[in-house]
Amino acid sequence: MNYSNIISDFTWSYSRLTAFEHCPYKFFLSYIKPHSERPLFFSDYGTFLHKIIEMRLNGKLCQDELVTFYLTNFRKEVVGAAPNRDIFNSYFEQGLNYLKNMDFPYPTPNAVEHRVDFFIGDKPFTGIIDCVAKDGDNIIILDNKSRALKPRSGRKKPTKSDLELDEYLRQLYLYSIPIQTEFQQYPERLEFNCFRTQQIIPEPFREDALEHAKLWALQTIDTITQNEDWSPKMEYWKCKYLCDHSHQCEYQLMNRG
């Protein structure tokens, strides 16, 4: 069934576009016929660390308060169950180690958790930029990531990790549109703060990559608007641990027998 009459009124976001790419039925349950969501370990964990980093940069927590806040609030904030004890322990320890010696590259950023509203063509978009900072006269967009991304390999043929990096960069390229409007210049760099691995991954801004991201966004919106088949993409790990609707997904429930 086509839902273009509903979809035409959407304000878009990067997460809304990727939700459809990951699973059309997840998109359906999230945005067309909204259902309640269940807590998930990975998203709860990422949200909690984002919150602590924001509080540190906004001055609501000082450096020597970070670990105590993390330890006393972890189980209240990270409600979803981890896939296994090893993953829980690994994530917990990596978050703790990051906060013990948090070395954020821009301790006095221009903006933290900066909301932006903008258009691509005639399509309205919204988003939250984790950090906007200046390096001299240059603008930097930084995204805090719980995912352990890898720096670009530099190989002639892109690796799987290079392609994954490019996928995540699309979000920051879209955010560069309102940043250009606000600061009258595009960012000089796009960066990921992969806090679990304590690695900053910088990427120089490229206008051709921006145009590619804009084209991807508009083509994805067109695909969603015309879509009539909302069948799921069934993958055990993603359905069980990454989908916040799997507890009420008929397809997943049938698979459980």
Give residue ranges: language-model regions.
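RecB-family 4Fe-4S metal-dependent nuclease core
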Residues: 1-257
